[in-house]
Structure formats: structure tokens, C-alpha cells
């Protein structure tokens, strides 16, 4: 029997937080794992087999589940874990193939309207934070905080840059641009996002060319992000919203402090080991000044938090593995359907 993940994209080609989190979760399982996704050819990545999903449009949540169900039957799927745009097709295909369906939920209902029907109809949902589980109406559901990469053996705080790991508008690129103008003697690194053409600034390169201390750098695979962390003094995450904040935790492993937008979900991750702010220029600047006023203390707090989170992660992955190994089809799916429906009625 096989565990099958279904996602619109998958590492190493798709390296956004949701895809990376799904991969690290699936890679932790001892059973055979296959992922169906958008890919030109089949491949294997860190022990996970990856195949082309049989659907013409991986970004269409209303894609026909029939062809996917046939794939699941061929793979002898026991459990199907779907997320994002392919969440509903994954649930319906799993049902047709006689497999158990699980939705990997990494956003609160406000930002997850498109997957609402999938969450309602699935056999189970797994949430990325306790706050998210409560907002979806399942406070007792399984919570698996997004796994981070192994933290380094020692800290590295010799960098000089204020770094933001995304160039998108919703990640606060405008805030960072204004900060670079405010601190002309400080180095700023902006790591570009592949979604920049649709969700970024059309004239970012022109803007950066007029700000000498603002550097644009290419996106790298998760295993190479250390190249930027080694150059970073403070990580900046002035996003409009964050549903967890993996990058801050990854940076914390290096002893790099962070100025981070404050949300209930972020508090379950980096939490108060970062300076939590509203996503504005003034608040982010205040956060920078606070860290610089006592850098060593903030660095040590960041590293300590990363170590604690890594221990929690090990425990959660063990529980998740045990759950997958023993999961059975629910005897009464309607109980969670009713709970999720009521909790998310206003966002549906």
C-alpha cells in the first residue's frame, strides 16, 4: 500500500513554503510515498517518488477527479494527502479509489476559501498551527507545524545585511525598499520570487538600480538558503500576513534575529524570540533598532527558540507517522463536516 501526496507543485522545482513543508512531512514516513504533481518527467527526490498528475490544469480546484482516481488505483493508494489547488480533486479521487483522504491545511479559513469544500469533505485534515485548527472548527485535530531543516551545529552571525527572502508585495517588498532608503549605510538583500511577475513590482529592477544599498539576488533551493543566512544580520518579514513563518525559524537556527509580522500563527513558530510588529515601515524600523540595541541577547533567544522548535518537531513527526500507519476511515465523517461548515460559514 502506498501513501500518495497530490500537489500542484513539488520540490526541487517548486520551493514555496507549502510545497517544502509537504515534502519534509512525506519524507519522514517509512512507508512507500509517491507524489502526483506537475512535472515534465518522473523523478525521485530525497526518497520520494514524483510522477505527473493526470489532470490538464493543476491550478484548477474543480479539475475532474476521475483520471486521478485511476492513478491512485494503479498505485494501490491507501492514504491520499492533498493540498492547495488540487485539494478537492484529491479528496474526490481518493473517495473513488477507496483510499483515505487527508487535506494538508496551511492557512486559516480567511486565506483558504478555495479549499473549504475539500476540508469539509475530506476524511481528515491536518493543520499547520493550533490557531488554524481552531479557526477551521477542529481544535482537537492533528497539528503538524511545518518542519524546518536541521539547524546547524553552531551559530553564524557575522553577516552585515538586512535580508528579506521574498520580493512579493504581500511579503512587504515596499516596506523593505523604504527601509533601504532610510538606512543608506546598511546593506539590504532582497531574494527574488518566481511569482514576482504576477505578485511583485513591475519596476523592481529600476527601483533597485536607484538605491545603491539594495541588492537583488536570485532564489535558491531550500538547502542553499544558508548562503544568504551567512550574509544576514537581521531577517526582515514585514509581510501583510504570515500563516506560520518558516524562514524566521530557519534563520534563528543560525542565531539570526528577526523583525516579523505578528499573527496568532507566527506566535506558535518563532514567537516572541522575534520582534513582532505590524507590517509598516515605522514598526519594522523600530524592530531593527530594538535588535541592534542588544543584538547578542536577541541572537541567543533566536537560537534557543530554534532548538526548542526542533525538539517539538521531532515529537510531532513521530505522532504523525504513527497516525498515518494506523489511520482508518472515520465511522462518522459528518461530525467534522458539520463542525468545519459552521466554523467557516462566513468565509465560504
Where in the sequence are the language-model features?
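N-terminal subdomain of nucleotide-sugar transferases
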Residues: 1-42, 348
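Short His-centered aromatic/hydrophobic patch
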Residues: 82-87, 105
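Conserved catalytic-core segment of nucleotide-activated headgroup transferases in glycan assembly
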Residues: 150, 156-206
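Nucleotide-activated donor-binding/catalytic signature segment of Leloir-type glycosyltransferases, i.e.
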Residues: 201-223
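Aromatic "clamp/platform" in nucleotide-sugar-dependent glycosyltransferases that forms part
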Residues: 240
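Short hydrophobic beta-strand element within catalytic cores of glycosyltransferases
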Residues: 257-260
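Conserved acidic donor-binding segment of nucleotide-sugar-dependent glycosyltransferases
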Residues: 274-282, 289-295
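A charged, aromatic-enriched C-terminal amphipathic alpha-helix characteristic of glycosyltransferases
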Residues: 293-337
Amino acid at each position: 500500500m502506498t501513501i500518495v501526496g497530490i500537489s500542484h507543485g513539488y520540490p526541487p522545482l517548486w520551493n514555496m513554503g507549502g510545497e517544502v513543508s509537504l515534502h519534509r512531512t512525506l519524507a519522514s514516513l517509512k512507508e512507500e510515498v509517491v507524489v502526483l504533481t506537475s512535472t515534465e518527467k518522473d523523478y525521485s527526490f530525497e526518497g520520494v517518488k514524483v510522477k505527473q498528475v493526470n489532470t490538464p490544469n493543476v491550478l484548477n480546484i474543480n479539475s475532474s477527479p476521475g483520471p486521478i482516481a485511476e492513478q491512485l488505483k494503479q498505485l494501490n493508494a491507501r492514504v491520499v494527502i492533498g493540498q492547495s489547488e488540487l485539494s478537492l480533486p484529491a479528496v474526490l479521487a481518493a473517495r473513488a479509489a477507496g483510499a483515505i483522504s487527508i487535506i494538508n491545511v496551511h492557512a486559516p479559513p480567511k486565506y483558504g476559501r478555495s479549499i473549504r469544500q475539500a476540508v469539509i469533505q475530506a476524511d481528515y485534515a491536518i493543520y499547520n498551527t493550533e490557531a488554524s485548527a481552531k479557526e477551521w472548527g477542529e481544535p482537537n485535530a492533528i497539528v503538524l507545524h511545518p518542519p524546518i531543516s536541521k539547524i546547524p551545529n553552531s551559530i553564524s552571525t557575522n553577516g552585515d545585511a538586512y535580508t528579506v527572502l521574498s520580493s512579493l508585495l504581500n511579503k512587504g517588498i515596499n516596506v523593505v525598499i523604504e527601509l533601504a532608503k532610510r538606512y543608506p549605510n546598511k546593506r539590504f538583500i532582497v531574494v527574488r520570487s518566481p511569482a514576482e511577475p504576477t505578485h511583485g513590482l513591475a519596476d523592481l529592477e529600476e527601483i533597485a538600480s536607484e538605491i545603491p544599498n539594495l541588492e537583488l539576488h536570485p532564489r535558491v533551493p531550500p538547502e542553499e538558503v544558508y548562503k544568504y543566512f551567512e550574509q544576514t544580520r537581521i531577517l526582515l518579514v514585514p509581510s501583510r500576513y504570515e500563516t506560520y513563518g518558516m524562514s524566521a525559524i530557519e534563520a534563528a537556527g543560525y542565531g539570526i534575529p528577526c523583525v516579523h509580522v505578528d499573527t496568532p500563527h507566527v506566535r506558535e513558530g518563532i514567537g516572541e524570540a522575534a520582534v513582532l510588529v505590524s507590517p509598516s515601515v515605522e514598526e519594522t524600523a523600530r524592530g531593527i533598532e530594538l535588535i541592534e540595541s542588544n543584538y547578542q541577547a536577541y541572537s541567543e533567544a533566536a537560537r534557543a527558540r530554534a532548538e526548542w522548535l526542533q525538539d517539538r518537531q521531532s515529537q510531532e513527526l513521530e505522532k504523525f507517522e504513527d497516525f498515518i500507519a494506523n489511520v482508518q476511515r472515520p465511522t462518522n465523517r459528518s461530525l467534522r463536516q458539520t463542525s468545519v461548515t459552521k466554523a467557516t460559514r462566513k468565509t465560504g
